[in-house]
Amino acid sequence: EGDFRIYTATVGETVGCTLQAEIRSPAGSRAVYRGELALPITGTLNGVHPWSIEHPTLYTLTVKLIRPGTSGLPDRVLDEKTVRFGFRTVQFVAGGLYLNGQRVVLRGINRHQSYAYQGYAMPDSLQRLDAQFIKKDLGCNAVRTSHYPQSPAFLDACDELGILVFTEMPGWQHLGDDPWKAQALQNCREMVCQCRNHPSVFLWGARVNGSPDDEAFYKRTNEAIHRLDPTRPTAGAHIRRREQLL
């Protein structure tokens, strides 16, 4: 069985509107659920196939914002959004990482999304090519997006190929003043909102890469991330010994 909980956010006039959520399996079966804007849509699907490194099964969710018809007029779809997702569990214990209850030995690399002579603005096809190199040529099962959230196309490819992703808040070594930290916290929130539907993402980077310790600030980044996603653990990358874990 696969449990799900669908949260939505809207902007604009939505009084009287309702939601319709449709989940489609890879085999084409459909399940439709209706709900209200103020509450999450929850449910359980039977016979789901979990997302894993060996079998990265993806389901498709389409959510529609509907204004009910009046005076004999039909309902009207005001907006809709389609995303892919997967059913899986991730847990770190003393013995290591467990994906869907099975222990996984991580073999991964750090990845920058810049290319010689072209920089960062590369098409989706090259983002996918990098993911294929990581999985099929290098034999890796994990990647760290060092050290910033990367192209949605790269995460899509990791979802499809079965690559675990450690994605991080942007930054490198530097910690700034209070306005800088306020923006960094917003970056953390945006990272979670942008990436949390990707089943490949198993770890949030809540620390600026290679930065000095700042217990109060990193407590806030952890809280900001876990407020939006309590299901995934957080981590941080270090360059010096005897530093705090976060």
Regions found by a protein language model. Give the residues of each.
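Active-site beta-loop-alpha junctions enriched in small/polar residues
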Residues: 111, 148-150, 170-172, 207-209, ...
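Hydrophobic residues in well-ordered beta-strands that form the structural core
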Residues: 165-167, 236
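Active-site neighborhood of glycoside hydrolase catalytic domains
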Residues: 160, 177-246
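Alpha-helix capping and helix-loop boundary segments enriched in small/acidic/polar residues
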Residues: 118-122, 145, 149, 175-182, ...
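Secreted/periplasmic carbohydrate-active enzymes, especially glycoside hydrolases
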Residues: 1-152, 156-165, 187, 202-203, ...
